[in-house]
Structures are given as structure tokens and as C-alpha cells.
Amino acid sequence: MSVRIEHDTFGEIEVPADKYWGAQTERSKRNFPVGKERMPIEVVYGFAQLKRAAAIANFDLGKLSEAKKDAIVYACDQILSGELDEHFPLVVWQTGSGTQSNMNVNEVVSYVANMYLKDHQSDESIHPNDDVNKSQSSNDTFPTAMHVALYQEVETKLEPALKLLRNTLKEKEDKFDSIIKIGRTHLQDATPIKLGQEISGWRYMLDRCETMLSESKKHILNLAIGGTAVGTGINAHPEFGDKVAHYISENTGYPFVSSENKFHALTAHDEVVQLHGTLKALAGDLMKIANDVRWLASGPRAGLAEISIPENEPGSSIMPGKVNPTQCEMLTMVAVQVMGNDTVVGFASSQGNFELNVYKPVIMHNTLQSIYLLADGMETFNNNCAVGIEPIEENIDNYLNQSLMLVTALNPHIGYEKAAQIAKKAHKEGLTLKESAIQTGYVTEEQFEAWIKPEDMVDPH
């Protein structure tokens, strides 16, 4: 393997000649061969947005030449294009401030920027610390890149997937509004409900999650940049943080602002905890929806079988013809993983000691994973399951007509105790509810027909 020699304050080190990173990235790569979880490329893109904005801000403030500013902006745009992904090899499991990933970006930006300057016959050169990292610290850059990445992924991936599934459920809600079925509480028969009403509960869960997500993501717009090492802003111009936030907003289209308290921004990540709490709530709702769907689709002959779902693949390696609710199982596993991630994010966020929380990479990794799992899970569940949900009306009608809980409609006419006697007699003697009611003498056939109307029970008002 062809190598080149790079150096840092620890001395010289060999780096692969075809890679753009420098000495500190190479040391991290060698010192932390831990796990397979690479630092998410979206964090790198968040850094690139930050370094780009910082270069422009430093130029505005007279701290960087125009040539250097242009070179750094060019390098950052190259990173944002996705052309340089291979040059960011570091794993999540590194220093808790994310210093090595910050330096990985600084070194790659410096390398590409220097090529740009050389191509433009400039005598200037870019240093990863003195120029790319000017007015910054890893302590304020990593949380800034984290917030930029999280906000963008919520906007571009999670929210569209949530809307997609929500809209499908709304279509099913409207389509099945005339189908009356038996409701169930405590896994036992209850009073009737429309299939559309049942699905409306699922849909409204997603409506509420969309609202909560919209609220919680607003806090992610606060950026730590400008706090530098401990929140005081040492080595940065007083206007630097605001300017960087402005330029990040200008390039992304999102209204980022510089946090009003940088001490908080470096040592606390409660804003991410709140965001992930919303992800956990969404996971809980998706767990409920997926479980309801697979229970209602259970069978085909010895289950509830009130709805059918698409048959996507063989379900068993031993039982011929078996088809399983695999999309529901996928979504419930996604939900469980997100709930586990929430524990990690909450605990890691509580570990800020004095002026810095040093669990930033694991907070970032778990939150991004939750966003991707939920987004992919909802889209896949929608396309391969939800769109194909159809009622099995014969079974729905049979369960409705056999249910003893229709007796509830007699309560206002004969009282709770007599109605209970009718239900118990029917269950014990294997009678229909109508037969039992007439045999007790509490109601006539005409009264039963007038009072027991499922269509009235689903819309009593």
C-alpha cells in the first residue's frame, strides 16, 4: 500500500496515499478499532455545513482571507455532494466529545482546499486547526453538527414517512366507515364499533405524533457554535456564533439560531432527549398499530381473520402454504429497538460533568438510528402491508351477531342487572342473545328488535 507521511503534535505517522485524512484521523483509526458502527455520514455532512458557514463568518470578521474562505467552501461543498464519503472512516466509539470526527472533517477539508488553492495558483495553504477549525472547538462543533444532522433527517426522512402512513390509514378509515364490527376491551368482546372508527384511532395517533415531532424538533434549531471550549467563547469573535447559524440557515433552508446559553449547549443534551422521547412515543404507537393489525389478520381459519393483509413471501420453512404477518413483526422489532435507544439517549444525556457532556457520539448514533428505523419501517409497512388491508366482512358479521355485549343497549330499558342475567343465560345455555332475552321475559321480540341495533350503538349521539 502506498503511503504518505503526515504529522501532528505527536509526531509523524503513515497515512494511505489515496486517502484525504491526516494524522489525527489515522491515530483514531488505529486507536479505536471498536465495533462496526461508523460515524454516520449525516454527521459528517452536518460538520461540512458548519465548516462552510464558519469559513464565511471568519472571512466576514476579518479572520480569514477570501482565497482561504473560497477554498474551504469548495471543499465543504464537495463533501456535501457525497463524493468524499470514503474519506471518513472513524467509528462512533471514540472520544466522547467527537474530537476525532471533528478533526477528520478538518483534515479532509484542509486537503481538498489545498488542492483547490494549488489549482488556482495560490501561494496560500490551509491548516486543519488554524483555518478550518478557526474560532471553534470540538466541544461546540460536534453538538452543532449533531443538531444540523438531526433536524435535517427528521425533516427529509421521518416526517415524510409518517405522513405517508398516516394518509394511508386515513384512506382506510374513510373506506371502511360503513362496516360495523365488534369492539374489544381487555381482549374480550365489547360493544360494537365501526372498522373505520377503529382505524381512526390509529390515524389520530400518528396525527398527534406529527404534532409532537413538529414541536420537539424546534429545540434542535439551537446551535452550540460560538461556545468554543467551555461555553465562554474564548478565541471566537462575539458575533461568530450568530453569523455561523445565519449561514447554516441560508445554505440549508432551516431556521437555525445560536443558542443563548452556550454553557448549557455544551454540557446538556435535553433537547435531543425530548426529541427522542417523541420518537419513543411514535414507536409505542406503531407497536400498537402493528399488533392490532396482526391480531385482526390472525388465522386464516383459526384466528380472528377480520381483515386480510398482503401475502408477500412464504412464512414457514416447514409448514407449506403458511403466510405470516412479517411486516407487522418488522415494525414491532423496530419499535423495541427505538425504545432501547431511548434509554441510551436519556442516560448518556444525563452524564454531563461540569462544562461538557462526553457521550455525544453515542447520543447521536442512537438518535439517528431511531430516525432511520422509524422512517424506513413506516414506509415499508405502508407499502407492503397497510395499503393492502381489506375487511373480511363475513367473519366481521359473524362475530358481531354472536357477541353477547350487544346486551349493553338494553341497560337503559331494563337495567344493568337484568341485562347481565340475559347475557349470562345466553352464554351458559348456548343461546343467542335474542333467544335468552325473550326466555327471561324481560323483553318482547319487538322490543329486542327495536333496542338492539348495532348501527345505533356505534353512533349513539
Swiss-Prot record:
Active site residues of this protein: 186 (proton donor/acceptor), 316
Enzyme Commission designation: 4.2.1.2
Pathway where this protein functions: Carbohydrate metabolism; tricarboxylic acid cycle; (S)-malate from fumarate: step 1/1
Sites marked Important for catalytic activity: 329
Chain positions recorded as substrate binding sites: 97-99, 127-130, 137-139, 185, 317, 322-324
One GO process term, biological-process aspect: malate metabolic process
Pfam families per UniProt: FumaraseC_C, Lyase_1
Primary residence: cytoplasm
UniProt cross-references to Gene3D superfamilies, sorted A to Z: Fumarase/aspartase (C-terminal domain), Fumarase/aspartase (Central domain), Fumarase/aspartase (N-terminal domain)
UniProt similarity note: Belongs to the class-II fumarase/aspartase family. Fumarase subfamily.
Summary of subunit composition and partner proteins: Homotetramer.
Function: Involved in the TCA cycle. Catalyzes the stereospecific interconversion of fumarate to L-malate.
Note: There are 2 substrate-binding sites: the catalytic A site, and the non-catalytic B site that may play a role in the transfer of substrate or product between the active site and the solvent. Alternatively, the B site may bind allosteric effectors.
Name this protein carries in UniProt: Fumarate hydratase class II
Lineage, top ranks: Bacteria, Bacillati, Bacillota, Bacilli, Bacillales
